[in-house]
């Protein structure tokens, strides 16, 4: 494949994405190189294709945009083939193939059925590039005129450069002016009007030809937009431009006379109308009535300064004056000439002004009067209305409206006000921005006053009455009382009504003034009522404004509230069954009111109150709207007007829900059924019977909007419920969701008058279920795993319903299929996004794609979250993964959603092994790496997109996709066609830049101001190195790479953290953590490879700053308890059952550091709407989130350093010079534990991890040779460990939350260190009395506690803790450290009841088995043995019933029968030998005659075992074990001791004879 070439569609997509992270400098550099493209008007994507066979495998090079790109042999073959089929230039074809090289490859071409399909696929991409190029220019032109745009400065410079480099073609090619660029486009546009499809396309069928014309006319329209934007406020229309333009208009009747026959009727007519309408607007803009009223001196380039131009234009426009198409242009030109004739200052400035005056201005047959009169015959106001209405979806409609409004304000003075005038004004000024420009215009003010004066006699002007109010509400200005009230009420008098008197007025001949002599009731003949009485009071005066009609029309002087009158009138129509007879009025009021209620909530609420003033209830106007909708939904047949009223009613209900949700719930749960019923028509009937037949889905989309806001209401009332029934809400939302699911299951098969509505339905449904699932499973409050809460029932019911419909298996994918189908339509959507000129349609297509991918990702994450079986969705996505990768380079807006979807797919848990992505991409494995590299090397991609790529690549290594990872990092592919050969792997370099080297190169551009974008890069490097070294061996790096990594590790020290936000600090810590782990991997590898290179590249650079780094990493300072305490207090007195913990994110999705990290702020804002101090709570939650982000990042840094230190400790074994540093690290970590002041619940796990790390290091320090320096460090470690143990944040005597996980490793450290010092120092070790006594007290108190716990819960962990503390206890008691502490020692035994509890444990030990053995008996006797090493200890043991416990234990039975130890491995035998016998020896030694009675009883009991042990020597030597030797030895020693105190006992048991027998046996 050739080198990468950036497409215009990508550039356009980047502009339209509006990503704040996009680099303007990169854009500017890129477009600077492409300025020449805009001079190639006919084809800005045409370069030069040159043959070049010097490189192996390369056939040609494409030179374009100041760069050269290689064309491979296979590509060149494809170029020639497509060029022959389509008739396009080979250079144009080569460009398209290069920008789509991963998609349009040889394999793709081989799959196409025929040449016609190939031609269409090529044209789709070719015109996407052409049109995208001109859209980019249009974007720059628009940015030039918007001083607030971030692109303004860049766009201005580029546009100036484009205009300045524009040259004429032909004789004067070297001359340049800003207008030349426009002239060249106009000339090309004129040429396009006579172009036909390439001859070669005629052989490819009608579809290919039709497609060519479709793109051809789309390109025309885009060029028209470029002309409009260029001349709207940038380039003054000079003579050359005007002549070129109007020549083209005359030739084509404003571009109307072109061949649209190859398109279908609807498409052809629509495109023809749109092109002609824009051409008319541009023509009016060229004439520029705004400039006509100014002095021509201010515009020296203006074409009106040329008399010849004026005459030429006049002739051309006059020729079209009798054509309705050009009526608006003729009117504009006529007004311009009228203004000129009344401008004595401008006429002299015109060249050949005398000729202009004689031929035009003073010629009655050819004057402006004739033009204006001819134009007015065709009703240009209706034409203006149609033009603006047809262009409502155009991105530049505001500019068009302003131009037409200027014409309207000038032309309205030439005519009487009529219906067409009012309709035109309504269309133009309904946009607030346009109205505000002309609100002070005299003509517009007069027209609006006229409309108010004629109301309600002409109720169609109701929209005009609302325009000023709408403008105020949109700009959030206070609506004046004058706008909300009417001062006149115009109606025709009732037939035969005479109860009025004419008031004579001197000098007044018309519009007679009259006064009512009695009240005039309006019920009998009217339907619009100004007051609740529905009458005009007696004494009301008015003027008869129409004497030529009967009955006469009277304009009454009456002050009344407009909205109150609207409410009263609609209510009267509904209550009296007059809806059908006044359907037009109802439709006018409702459709006109929707935009007002869509503005500010407070303004909308105020309007509802005003409309309800004359009704029964405070918000009764809402009930009127509900009744209207109810009526039309109850009809057996629905007509077009009925349908429009239903749509407007639904839209109004949606807006009413914002401030009157209970009223709307009452209606929808009562009347808005979702399936057919006996009551009449239902939602199902409207959509499936009316909309699917007519292809218009306004009602469906309105219902989506209503349903979504009702769901929001369910969320906002989940904490503080409203007064409406939960059961009714649940019933409605379930039924509605079933209905919407049916809509979604069928919508792809429906007919569409506007395809954009298909995209909108797909987007709305996908967004709706994504939102619903995020709410229900996103925070703890709604989580179905938690205890059921009836307040959240509607949402829980819905979530389960969605899960059941979409997380399905293969045989039930009816609802899943439409969601997946969006991937089958990517080609179509690509055309709509880039090749068509409808911005709303392109935006809707993008949103549909993005929302569908997000919905799939949510479902996949949810499946793992709920531990469900893998669904058909995942299987389908795995099989479609090649298609997803292929579309990545085409759709910038979808890169992040698609990669996030693939990451979720890879990381989702499977019951067995995750499917291999490699297996599904067996024919295109190299595409993954190539596409990722293309995106990463794109000069204008954002940090968000780049981060998505790195995260996806990291997920490949995390998600058991080792096969694909190996190919990615090795630069190899695995083609299917080589499977049969022995050489399966074929080396094919991805590009000159591998993914790993590309990631490491990113480190060169590291900036402290852009930490967030670097975090995914460091994570990828860490994972890739970890994976690579595990799979393919060591990967060597250059020294500068390690310098950058070491610098990253030092960032917490080298960066001034106070100057960073909490989130930025958190990102910095995470980045440093990844860097630390990278070095840890290298240390491990160096140890395995027995290499010392890591010392030089890692340890030496870090050695000097190691202390600060370790202390910073292991000292947790981020947690701010004040924030969290204040947050807890804020929710403590919350009404309802909401706790702050309910707002925690559940972890359904990976969490990002920031103000939404731990607590879900987005949902909390909605849920806390009805609570007190909402803003304070949200602010505190955001602060807590940022604080917890920092805490989590510090924890990650701590754990990374733990990994590093473990690797470092192993490395110390190879380099003894680092041993002192190892000891210092122990001290630094212990100090952080000892001085930690953070809440125990927050740092308990981290404290345990730090303690475990210290223990691990201490295991390694045992081998360090003792020196004075080492001794000092070990003593410091001993004291710091004791300080960490005695910290007040934990208690070793409380183990309810697993505190021993913290203390256990520290006790090990104490033992290791103390034992090492005692083994070396012997009698010379000096420790404080407080330390030794405190340690003894701790041992006895904790052991006593453990003895008690073992009786209740005899686990292996308890046994291990007893053994550990016994060892520590023994270490002290058996050393010189116990000297002088005997009295304290005895007091600890007595105070803690340790001996008593130990004996109790021993008594129960026969039933407290671990792995079937009485290990606790052994542990208990070990403790007693240590205690018996002193006389006082031995006495305490005896006093607490030692002999009784021994003689009552199950062991006594074995002793009394003898034969214990026959198998040599019994734990009881070991207890006897190593526990009881030594303990008896100590007791006899210290207590002597005082225990002889107890001793005699025990000896007599155990005599069979004693006899067995001594006579065991008669057995063959092979039967005598070391244990039996120990046993005999201990018995002999014990009896020798007893000989001193009780010789009679020995005689009693005939011990002398036993000794003789034993000696005789031993000599045999």
Swiss-Prot record:
The keyword ATP-binding does not apply. GO terms for molecular function: structural constituent of nuclear pore. It is found in: Nucleus, Nuclear pore complex. GO terms for biological process: mRNA export from nucleus; NLS-bearing protein import into nucleus; protein export from nucleus; protein import into nucleus; RNA export from nucleus. The keyword Transport applies. Pfam families: Nup188_C, Nup188_N-subdom_III. Its main location: nucleus. Gene3D superfamilies: 1.25.10.70. One of its GO terms (cellular component) is nuclear pore. InterPro entries: Nup188, Nup188_C, Nup188_N-subdom_III. Keywords: mRNA transport, Nuclear pore complex, Nucleus, Protein transport, Translocation, Transport. It comes from the Eukaryota. Coiled coil: none annotated. Signal peptide: none annotated. Interacts with pom152 in the core structure of the nuclear pore complex (NPC). Involved in the export of mRNA. This is Nucleoporin nup184. It comes from Schizosaccharomyces pombe (strain 972 / ATCC 24843).
